[in-house]
Each structure stands twice: as C-alpha cells, then as structure tokens.
C-alpha cells in the first residue's frame, strides 16, 4: 500500500519543529503534541511502522483525528502491527466523525471487508466511546455523536441526531445550528417536544461539568 495518503492528514506544524519530545514532556502533552505527530509521520517515511503505529495510537486514543486516520491506514495495511480490519474501521470512522474527509472513503473500503456482526460491534464501540467523552465534559464529541446517528448507523437515527445537534447548538459549536435545522425536517413533529425536553435536561447536566 502506498503511504503517500498519510500526508493528507499531516498537521500544520510549528516553525523549527523538534521531532523528539523533551524527556520531561507530560503524557497529556505527548498525546496531543505536534512533535509526537511529526515523529510518527517521520517513522512512516523511515519505514519504522511499528513505532509509527505506537505513536499514532497514543494520539488516536486522545481523540486526535488526523492520527486516527493515519492509524487506520496502517492497521488496514498490516504494517507495524498485524492487519486488523475491525480496528482500522473503528479509527477510520472516528477520524471521519472528527472531520477528516478522506476517512469517509477509507471507511467504505474497510466496511466491504467485514461481516455484519463486526460492523455492529464497531458501531457500538464508537457510540460508547463518544458517550464516555461527553460524560467527562468533552463537548467536541457532541457533534461527532450527532453525526454518528445521522450517517454511520445501518439506518439513520434522525431523532438522536437531532437531540445531540440541539445540545451542540446550545453550546454554540460550529456548524451545529445548521445541522440541527437540516435534521429537524426528518423528525416526526410529534417527537420534537420530547426530544427538545431531553436536550434541555442533558444540556443542564453537561453545563455543570467543568
């Protein structure tokens, strides 16, 4: 597999970037830093795929979506770690929900390689991960969860998508209001009041999380 596609998700890195992180760099910094990401990209160029997988995975678990995309590519190819289509799909879907557009086609390619039960389990894991992120106050996961319900289920769940877009709108997340209004036309009128009340309750709860 050609890894030129990895460059699609490379971040805009600071000037005079140092590839190796300082020894005292905190783990929280390592999981989100451009230095770690750049080191992983360099590892791919050097064909040190195992090191690249380890670094991308570290950042993928911290919801760094470009790292998730690159990790999905590596897991799909089986370089640096045994090929695993289900894990690759999990990270490709995660990357797409986080705004990495090339992950959409990658996800479609991987889906064709998996049975229905594996797709179901992967969807469940995505949903649980997003809900866990929301529970600890990660508001960026609100839009991702709404998009998950709108696009990644076997059949769209417009009601749940509307619920979470509504909450994201109240927090003024980018694109949430437009997405909410677009989805609303697909929701039965008799359900709107109930969904809006649920959204208000969840919003109040999330507002208490610092």
Describe the function of each predicted region:
Residues 11-21:
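Bacterial N-terminal signal peptides
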Residues 24-54:
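N-terminal leader/linker segments that initiate helical-solenoid repeat arrays
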Residues 31, 47-48, 61-65, 77-79, ...:
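Short helix-capping/linker turns of helical repeat alpha-solenoids
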Residues 36-43, 55, 70-77, 106-114, ...:
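Hydrophobic face of amphipathic alpha-helices that form TPR/SEL1-like repeat modules
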Residues 41, 106-136:
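Alpha-helical adaptor scaffolds
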Residues 47-51, 82-91, 118-128, 156-160:
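Structural signature of tandem alpha-helical TPR/SEL1-like repeats
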Residues 83-101, 108, 158-175, 181, ...:
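TPR/TPR-like (Sel1-like) alpha-helical repeat modules
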Residues 121, 132-133, 175-210:
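Terminal, low-structured helical/coil segments at or just beyond the last alpha-helical repeat
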């Amino acid at each position: 597999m050609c890894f030129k596609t990895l460059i699609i998700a490379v971040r805009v890195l600071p000037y005079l970037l140092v590839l190796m992180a300082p020894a005292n760099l905190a783990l929280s910094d390592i999981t989100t830093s451009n230095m770690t990401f750049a080191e992983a990209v360099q590892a791919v160029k050097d064909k040190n795929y195992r090191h690249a997988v380890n670094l991308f995975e570290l950042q993928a678990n911290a919801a760094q979506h470009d790292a998730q995309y690159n990790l999905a590519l590596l897991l799909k190819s089986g370089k640096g770690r045994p090929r695993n289509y289900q894990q690759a799909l999990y990270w490709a879907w995660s990357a797409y929900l986080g705004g990495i557009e090339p992950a959409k086609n990658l996800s479609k390619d991987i889906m064709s390689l998996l049975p229905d039960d594996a797709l179901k389990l992967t969807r469940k894991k995505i949903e649980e991960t997003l809900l866990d992120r929301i529970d600890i106050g990660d508001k960026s996961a609100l839009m991702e969860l709404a998009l998950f319900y709108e696009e990644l289920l076997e059949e769209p769940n417009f009601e749940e998508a509307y619920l979470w877009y509504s909450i994201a709108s109240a927090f003024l997340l980018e694109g949430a209001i437009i997405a909410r209004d677009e989805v609303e036309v697909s929701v039965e009128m008799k359900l709107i009041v109930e969904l809006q009340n649920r959204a208000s309750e969840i919003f109040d709860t999330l507002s208490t999380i610092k």
